[in-house]
């Protein structure tokens, strides 16, 4: 794993939920694990899974899968939140992201982890209240919400933390009273134990 901050052991109380956020990509897949409970959020770890462009696609996807399995094994998340693929002009790039997304969904399905997918604008709205917010605004608020010393880097890791926080705001705020509930109506596709 390529963690970008100090890892923290997850809490042990039954009222705590652990969410892993994922920003999928073949070259770099961002991940961020947060803990929600008692009206607060806590960052457990974040980082990026980097693959080598000179390796076959199958080997790169296997590396993403294996690293995600390690993250799951260590932090035992109950929920996963994934940023959806946006329509890009570059078809090749979109296909690469789709491949990485498939590996993410498989890794979660194998461990019976519920998965939710959020559109980029829904993530921005959940964090800032503005669907067209700038990336820097989102990152700054993620830093504040998770009580981090600095804005998370690289961007893929920050995006992964943002989608994890979005899941709390959209689907868990009534239980954990964390942040605003303004985004409950945002677009989200839920997958419960492999069933859509």
From Swiss-Prot:
Mg(2+) 1 binds at residues 23, 156. Its EC number is 3.1.21.10. GO terms for biological process: DNA recombination; DNA repair. GO terms for molecular function: crossover junction DNA endonuclease activity; DNA binding; magnesium ion binding. Coiled coil: none annotated. This is Crossover junction endodeoxyribonuclease RuvC. Keywords: Cytoplasm, DNA damage, DNA recombination, DNA repair, DNA-binding, Endonuclease, Hydrolase, Magnesium, Metal-binding, Nuclease. Pfam families: RuvC (PF02075). PANTHER family: CROSSOVER JUNCTION ENDODEOXYRIBONUCLEASE RUVC (PTHR30194:SF3). Belongs to the RuvC family. Binds 2 Mg(2+) ion per subunit. One of its GO terms (cellular component) is cytoplasm. It catalyses: Endonucleolytic cleavage at a junction such as a reciprocal single-stranded crossover between two homologous DNA duplexes (Holliday junction). Mg(2+) 2 binds at residue 83. It is found in: Cytoplasm. The active site is at residues 23, 83, 156.
């Amino acid at each position: 794993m390529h963690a970008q901050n100090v890892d923290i052991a997850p809490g042990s109380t039954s009222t705590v939920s652990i969410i892993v956020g994922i920003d999928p990509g073949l070259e770099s897949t961002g991940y961020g694990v947060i803990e929600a409970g008692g009206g607060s959020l806590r960052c457990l770890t974040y980082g990026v899974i980097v693959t080598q462009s000179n390796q076959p696609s199958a080997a790169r996807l296997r590396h993403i899968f294996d690293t995600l399995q390690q993250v799951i094994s260590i932090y035992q998340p109950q929920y996963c939140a994934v940023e959806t693929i946006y329509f890009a002009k570059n078809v090749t790039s979109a296909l690469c992201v789709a491949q990485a997304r498939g590996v993410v969904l498989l890794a979660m399905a194998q461990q019976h982890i519920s998965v939710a997918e959020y559109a980029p604008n829904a993530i921005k709205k959940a964090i800032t209240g503005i669907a067209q917010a700038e990336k820097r605004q989102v990152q700054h608020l993620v830093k504040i919400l998770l009580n981090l010393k600095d804005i998370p880097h690289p961007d893929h890791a920050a995006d992964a933390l943002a989608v994890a926080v979005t899941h709390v705001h959209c689907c868990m705020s009534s239980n954990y009273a964390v942040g605003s509930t303004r985004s409950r109506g945002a677009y989200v596709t839920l997958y419960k134990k492999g069933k859509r």
